[in-house]
Amino acid sequence: MSALDPAVASRLKRNADGLFTAVVQERATGQVLMVAWMDDDALARTLETREATYFSRSRGEQWVKGLTSGHTQRVHSVRLDCDGDTVLLEVDQVGGACHTGDHTCFDADLLLGPDL
């Protein structure tokens, strides 16, 4: 695997642990599926392979979405936000995006519904 392009790396703002936020959106629906963490290596792997790769803070290692579950994310595009501290991955989701098996990590707890 190649390293992250220095031109991209220089634009990223990371936290004290060297991580930044990744927001994952489904290409077909525009629905936000999940929020995860990435490090430079995870982003480099994602850009190189188009397989969504994240960094697990609890395990202290990278993980490729769907490698064990089969619930994969094929990356269509990656965008950097205006502050440089968040990337947006637009993906084609196969199966549930959430570790609970739900389609999104935001299916379970509606705190405020639409004002009808």
From Swiss-Prot:
Its EC number is 3.5.4.19
Residues where Zn(2+) binds: 82, 98, 105
Which biological process annotations from GO are given for this protein?
A: L-histidine biosynthetic process
Q: What's this protein's name?
A: Phosphoribosyl-AMP cyclohydrolase
Q: State the free-text cofactor note.
A: Binds 1 Mg(2+) ion per subunit. Binds 1 zinc ion per subunit.
Looking at its record, which EC class is this enzyme? hydrolase
Q: Which reaction does it catalyse?
A: 1-(5-phospho-beta-D-ribosyl)-5'-AMP + H2O = 1-(5-phospho-beta-D-ribosyl)-5-[(5-phospho-beta-D-ribosylamino)methylideneamino]imidazole-4-carboxamide
Localisation: Cytoplasm
The cofactors required by this protein are: Mg(2+); Zn(2+)
Q: What does this protein do?
A: Catalyzes the hydrolysis of the adenine ring of phosphoribosyl-AMP.
Give the similarity note.
Answer: Belongs to the PRA-CH family.
- State the source organism's domain of life: Bacteria
Enumerate the UniProt keywords alphabetically.
Amino-acid biosynthesis, Cytoplasm, Histidine biosynthesis, Hydrolase, Magnesium, Metal-binding, Zinc
Which Pfam family, just one, is annotated for this protein? PRA-CH
Q: Which residues form a coiled coil?
A: none
Residue sites binding Mg(2+) per the record: 81, 83, 85
Checking SUPFAM superfamilies in the record gives:
HisI-like
Pathway of action: Amino-acid biosynthesis; L-histidine biosynthesis; L-histidine from 5-phospho-alpha-D-ribose 1-diphosphate: step 3/9
